[in-house]
Curated annotation (Swiss-Prot):
CDD domains: YajQ_like (cd11740). It comes from Bdellovibrio bacteriovorus (strain ATCC 15356 / DSM 50701 / NCIMB 9529 / HD100). The keyword tRNA processing does not apply. This is Nucleotide-binding protein Bd0338. Belongs to the YajQ family.
Length: 161
């Protein structure tokens, strides 16, 4: 029976490349000269450290630009609120959103079922598996979900006939 998976994944190597590019730009920019500004990355989340709000905002802008240029959807990152880090420093955590959580999965399933397409969506861990007897129905389902406005980037893979 034909099927495909709806997933939300991020290429961690591309994120790593974007973080390294952002670090280089932060080190080279004139408005960061002589100030303490640091971008930390531990494969799960990033931490922006700087002396004031302006520098945190500039670092966030640089990071978003570099991620976008490397093909990472900006919906895949979540900026936490800025907090005090001690020693007159400010900290902002940036987390990567991977996988489809239950609430968003329910919204996607509701969208698919309301469309009256002859497909069967089901939740499997942090992804959705959609099956049907017709490949055409699956392709209509893909275009329907692409048109939906969801708060995270969605990819469609493992299309099997």
């Amino acid at each position: 029976m034909p099927s495909f998976d709806i997933v939300s994944e991020i290429d961690v190597q591309e994120v790593d490349n974007a973080v390294n590019q952002a670090r280089k730009e932060i080190e080279a920019r004139y408005d960061f000269k002589g100030s303490k500004a640091e971008l930390q990355w531990d494969k799960k989340e990033m931490v922006l450290l700087a002396e004031d709000d302006y520098k945190i905002g500039a670092m966030a802008g640089i990071l978003q630009t570099k991620l976008h240029r490397r093909g990472i959807d900006i919906k895949a990152i979540k900026f936490e609120k800025i907090e005090e880090a001690g020693g007159r420093m400010l900290r902002q955590k940036v987390t990567l959103v991977q996988g489809i959580d239950r609430e968003i999965a329910k919204d996607i399933i509701k969208l698919i079922k309301d469309s009256k397409l002859k497909v069967q969506p089901q939740v499997a861990d942090d992804k959705l598996k959609v099956t049907s007897k017709s490949i055409d129905e699956l392709q209509e389902c893909i275009s329907l979900v692409r048109g939906g406005n969801f708060p995270l980037p969605l990819q469609f893979n493992n299309m099997r006939a």
